[in-house]
């Protein structure tokens, strides 16, 4: 599966969260990064070039700061201009049909505030309805967003977990699958980590993989016991 990450940020060099994600980007031919503001500093988007780029990938992820419940202006412009009729929808407009559509949201407010009774009052699922509608309109499969809350307050351990989650989101066919995440961790240990990760990162991935495998085994054992009890 080939993944394209479209990044939009008015000043990416001053964003600690975006810099962290850029540095965490996997070294893989199957994953590419496309920074809109860097590509189009004058704000004039090459629509045909963008459309041709989209055709090359199976999964398209949009990475941006989620302020005022929306995206930076250049990404909004991108949606308006690139996803035009006869390309993304309408007569013969099925060029993106069957591809995956996902969001990577950097959010400054705490996760607990995005619920009924919280400061924001609405869930992330509710606030991202316009993006879900876009995906439906152009016949792409909408993925559950990867949400990153209050990055500056994350501990080093939390950031290491985020690094793993981020790479999984970009590389795994079903990033929500426990089995797929477990297989990815084992594969990283077998192939990538020995070559590209330092000792601390490799040890952390090993620890996470071991914990996840044990958690999965416990869940499976509990499920078997539940089934056995119901059969008696």
Tell what function each PLM region has:
Residues 13-14, 69-71, 111-113, 152-154:
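Short catalytic/ligand-binding loop motif for oxyanion handling, primarily in non-cytosolic enzymes
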Residues 77-86, 125-128, 160-163:
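Charged helix-capping and loop-helix junction motifs
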Residues 7-9, 105-108, 147:
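Short loop/turn segments at strand-loop or loop-helix junctions that form parts
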């Amino acid at each position: 599966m080939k993944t394209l990450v479209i990044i939009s940020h008015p000043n990416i060099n001053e964003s600690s969260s975006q810099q962290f994600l850029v540095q965490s980007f996997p070294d893989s031919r199957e994953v590419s990064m496309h920074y809109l503001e860097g590509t189009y500093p004058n704000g004039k988007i090459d629509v045909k070039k963008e459309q041709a780029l989209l055709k090359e990938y199976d999964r398209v992820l949009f990475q941006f700061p989620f302020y005022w419940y929306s995206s930076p202006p250049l990404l909004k412009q991108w949606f308006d201009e690139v996803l035009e009729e006869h390309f993304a929808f309408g007569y013969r407009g099925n060029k993106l049909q069957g591809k995956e559509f996902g969001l990577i949201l950097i959010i400054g407010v705490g996760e607990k505030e995005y619920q009924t009774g919280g400061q924001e009052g609405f869930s992330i699922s509710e606030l991202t309805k316009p993006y879900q509608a876009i995906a439906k309109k152009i016949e792409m499969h909408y993925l559950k967003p990867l949400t990153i809350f209050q990055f500056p307050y994350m501990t080093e351990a939390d950031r290491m977990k985020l690094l793993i989650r981020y790479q999984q989101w970009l590389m795994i066919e079903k990033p929500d699958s426990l089995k797929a995440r477990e297989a990815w961790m084992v594969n990283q240990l077998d192939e990538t980590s020995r070559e590209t990760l330092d000792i601390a990162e490799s040890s952390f991935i090993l620890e996470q993989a071991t914990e996840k495998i044990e958690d999965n085994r416990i869940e499976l054992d509990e499920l078997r016991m539940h089934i056995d009890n119901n059969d008696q």
